[in-house]
């Protein structure tokens, strides 16, 4: 199997290119401490990630408060606290996974167009790309708030293929989460699952991506 006929590679961000869990956890704990709730560990926060910022905050609150229903007012307030806390630590401890830089270089030299499709708020993407010095690899990116729908909806994938003047057949999605694989399936697009990411502590192969890789560097053999 290889994907040398593709023109566009659509990457997920958190759990695929970068490990941002340390900073997401810091921001979540800042929010929880505001409500005099106990801090969570990275391990506890990991399965809450993948659907965007608000679901992350909601899951952390539900986990911490256990019995009470989380009101919309509480969630909105907690989200604001989390959002401003995350702004302060966006790239404090976030790092690229092993092999990402070399592989992006390789794919770039081969002439593939590369973009990012994330369920992270759009405004946080660029500061991280800048800090890690990888912005130049990507033609554009969309976040959870860029369009009216986010992954697992196919809309962001159609949008990116369209923006890059290519077809679904010539595009491929690379991600660690079921949302990435389901979005690709909803768009009738091929997909590559990476096994080292978050994915709610579930096995990515359960969602039937076209192929699964265990490290980012493995992509060099597929393109």
Residues of each region from the PLM?
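Residue-level detector of anion-binding/catalytic polar loops
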Residues: 38, 113, 190
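Asp-based, Mg2+/Mn2+-dependent phosphohydrolase catalytic module
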Residues: 1-6, 122, 127-223
